[in-house]
Amino acid sequence: MAKKVTGQVELMIPAQQAAPSPPVGPALGQHGVNIMEFVKSFNAATANMKPGTIVPVVITIYSDRSFTFILKTPPASYLLKEAAGIKTGSGDPKRNKVGKITVNQLREIAEMKLKDLNTEDIEMAMRTIAGTARSMGIEIEGYKG
C-alpha cells in the first residue's frame, strides 16, 4: 500500500549548506521529520554543485514521518546575477542598467532552466529568461527577443 502524504514543504537552501537551523529546522520539525537525516541527504545530493548556490527543494512528507525530496534548478534571477557578476538587480530597471550578459550566456541559462519551465522550446525559454533579466536591469547584448 502506498504511503499517505501528510505535507509538502518548499524551501530554498544553499547547496551543501543545509543545517538544522531556520529555515530548515522549523519547517520540517513541525511535521515530525528527522531533520538531521534530511540535512545529510540534502548535502550529499548537492555535493556536485558549487557551494552556496541557492537550490529550491520540494520535500514530500509521509504519514510514517519519512520523506522524499526533489531538487529544482536554481532561480533564474540567481543564475542571471552570477552570469552578469552583480550582487543585486536594479531598483529602477527601465532607467538604471546594472549588468550585461551575452546571448550565449542567456541560452546556457535557458537550457539549464528548461526542465523547470512550462515549455519544451529553447527559444521560448530564452524569452522567459530574457524577461526576468529585463526586469532586473540586465541587458542582453545582441538579443532581439
From Swiss-Prot:
InterPro entries: Ribosomal_uL11 (IPR000911), Ribosomal_uL11_bac-typ (IPR006519), Ribosomal_uL11_C (IPR020783), Ribosomal_uL11_C_sf (IPR036769), Ribosomal_uL11_CS (IPR020785), Ribosomal_uL11_N (IPR020784), Ribosomal_uL11_N_sf (IPR036796). It comes from the Bacteria. SMART domains: RL11. Pfam families: Ribosomal_L11 (PF00298), Ribosomal_L11_N (PF03946). One or more lysine residues are methylated. GO terms for biological process: translation. GO terms for cellular component: cytosolic large ribosomal subunit. SUPFAM superfamilies: Ribosomal L11/L12e N-terminal domain, Ribosomal protein L11, C-terminal domain. Keywords: Methylation, Ribonucleoprotein, Ribosomal protein, RNA-binding, rRNA-binding. One of its GO terms (molecular function) is large ribosomal subunit rRNA binding. Part of the ribosomal stalk of the 50S ribosomal subunit. Interacts with L10 and the large rRNA to form the base of the stalk. L10 forms an elongated spine to which L12 dimers bind in a sequential fashion forming a multimeric L10(L12)X complex. Belongs to the universal ribosomal protein uL11 family. Forms part of the ribosomal stalk which helps the ribosome interact with GTP-bound translation factors. This is Large ribosomal subunit protein uL11. The lineage of its organism: Bacteria, Pseudomonadati, Aquificota, Aquificia, Aquificales.
